[in-house]
Amino acid sequence: MKKIISKTIWIVSLLAGLGLIITSYAGWLNPNTWSWLSLAGYAFPLFLLLTMVCLVICALIRKRYLLVPFFALIAAYPAVSLYFPLHFAALGDPVTSDSTLTVISYNTYNWSWGEGVKDKNEKPNRVVEFLAALDVDVMCLQESPLTGYSTNELNRQVTKKLQYIDTIHGHGASTLTLISRFPIVRKQFIDYDTKGNISGAFWLNVRGREVIILSNHLQTMGFTMGEREDFSSMVHGEKESRNEIKNTSHTIAGKILSASKIRANQAEALAAFIRDHKNEPLIVCGDFNDIPQSYTYHTISSALDDEADALTDCYRAVAAGPGFTYSRYGIRARIDHMFCSSHLEPIHCRVDRTTDASDHYPIICQMIFR
């Protein structure tokens, strides 16, 4: 019996460790080439948990197997620190001064109309109320169409202290809105393959220095409300039929792969824009609709890796915890991100979970010029 237990611990530890390493580096794989294998990164949290459990079990029962999960964690450390950074000093209050630049990226979900607001003219609007209470310099808002009502609400509560506002409209219904304390010099629509999503750049004059804000709302998964509810039921163990679980899993995975292929092309277009402006202060932010262990994230974050100065993931650099920006229907993930070029240094970053007005939580980061 002891031999069976010992062998089982060895096999499970080995498989968990291999799975952790594979899922850690799945973001290098283009879904247009590697198809299903490129989605392995979505299983990273599961293999991380399994490896941690194996580490504890080996430490308590079979110390001679301890090296297996230990070395797996070492090999996967870059992905582990990306998924769960541990900068606990960042949990304190941010330092504010005239030399800092504080930016929020927030998918407002059409000013939360999709979150059960029956009256689009509901007052007060919870998204606008949340924004009005913030002390930030720049607001990068996705899914934020400026209707007469939303414009009036912003004018009444927000633009009194952040007086510059502009928008970029995509081929579909999606809108990027930027509200700034600093003058908006110009803007540029980023043209790429999309089904109703959008990216755009805004040039700001920040205390005499020109800074580019590249705001993004990348390809959505395209789940219907019914599919989201089916997935939630499956995650919470409410689906008992094997066929139901199989059908739901197949539908969800198929849509993730389809959207990932589109986002891969979008990410490559954004990486080209980033390289074209590598000598300018640049902030890249928005709703990427993808996780840190994805090709989308890897392509954008590594756009300048061949250069002397790479992009910095602000959350990874100074924050703590997994920082989930989406938590609905059994899905918990960090899919909203913010990067800065080497001209800027992040000093504080957090995901604000005090508001549930939208289906996303905003990410707020503070930087200083180097």
Question: What are the residue ranges of the model-derived segments?
Answer:
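Acidic/histidine-rich helix-loop elements
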Residues: 105-124, 222-259
